[in-house]
């Protein structure tokens, strides 16, 4: 069955790629350095109506630009943007257009990220996207309609990210689907920047498995980084770290020897040592994997939950910023107002913001 699915999808990718492979797109000037994710607005939220409209406004964009960010990553979900029968949701698209207009006004670039599909959630047990041809076509049709709405925006200001954190049983299943998706977008927008992430949550360990279209200079390879997990997801309610009841440290050994007896199931992971050199070795895996395509890389998500020990969190952010700058990696911290946010309520986390922006 797996071989049949891959063979079928491969035919589609090969066929659809012919339309642009002979005449590769010219390089545009979309460049990003330091961004922030606008989470829980058009993605991962049940809020609608006036409350949704008030969650992210022109004042937020002005504030973000004033801090010194140069872009936002804007997650959108299929269920917010489209009805179950595939019709566009006018209110959601109006909000998206508002955000893009505000970003243009305040000179912020935007990565529009199709975050969650009805047929794919990165933490769901069942993901029909990888086994159902109709689900795949629905995914491509989402992008045709998104492109139809957004193609009027400058290719130097707005980029598309195909999908957030794919989790297929086999990386080649995702490779076939994502390359077909790129081909669909290329039929409509030959020179738009497209971000592609690798299988299994866009991990730094799987970028080597990502297959990227050749001779397309407007592709960016995207990865996410949440290591060490005991720190970044400290006591996260949705994670196995929810019962972590000892401090976690950075840099150095994550859990002190004196606390090991109380660390429970986290003792083994807690013995790991993390520092800037370890993180850089992980980044180099991404850099090396991207070199064969001569493409830039982008860290679309990274961050530490607000519940983590403050001083350790700040040291981690400073090291991340040092490495991003050292290797010329664009990035967007997760997130703006959520559990990892640079705002707590309306209160700016100034020390955290300064560490992220290198101030």
Regions found by a protein language model. Name each.
Residues 133-273, 280-304, 326-329:
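Active-site region of glycoside hydrolase catalytic domains
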Residues 20-71, 86, 289, 355:
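N-terminal carbohydrate-binding accessory modules
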Residues 76-90:
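Glycine-rich, proline-tolerant flexible connector loops at the mouths of alpha/beta enzymes
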Residues 1-7:
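Positively charged n-region of N-terminal signal peptides that target proteins for export
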Residues 308-359:
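Aromatic-rich peripheral "rim/lid" segments of glycoside hydrolase catalytic domains that contact
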Residues 7-16:
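Bacterial N-terminal signal peptides
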Residues 52-55, 59-71, 87-116, 123-159, ...:
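An active-site-proximal structural segment forming one wall of the substrate-binding cleft
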